[in-house]
Amino acid sequence: MNMNSVNETTYPVLSAITGRWSPYRFLDQPVGNHELCCCLEAARWASSSYNDQPWFWVVAKKEEQQRFEVMVRCLLEPNRRWAATAGVLLLSVMRTSLKHNHQPNPVALHDLGQASAHLALQASELGLQVHQMGGINRSFTRHTLAIPEGFEPCTISAIGYPDLGDPQTQEDREYASRQAASRRRKDLVSCVFGGSWGETAEAVTKTV
């Protein structure tokens, strides 16, 4: 994907959505605290069941060398190699039970995902990009970052300014090729049903 590219949508959506993508290469440019907090602010205003807000984050900025290196080690290979070029690594953590009754929260992961989407779209609006990774060592992450019982480490997001320059190494060329690849999403008719599973939804087959 290049700087002037946008995601091709069937229907008009927000520019932050059409401009969002997941880089493998980042510029050696710090992410300011203000910009990072804007992204986290967007995340915390996501909706959640019972307003439970089951989301938590652990942040490591690249200039915080020791913390950043620890967060890099929480990743699985090959994510470590490219994610280490980002300005920020952000671990998302989910509380698994509801605050008001201490019962399991069956939609905690949904709510954390919604907050994560808010964060990624706010980043896109600011000229940043976010690459979210499920490839983390959860047991190592839990132990190293002292995550207590009742909380689950979920993903680590690489946040920064995407590098769209000419690659200098073979590995960099491979990452650049991934970035330049066309992006596709399945059609609405294949994932939106009407009435019952597999039944065509008239709303997505007829344009009003």
What does each of the following model-derived ranges do?
Residues M1-V208:
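Acidic, surface-exposed loops and disordered segments
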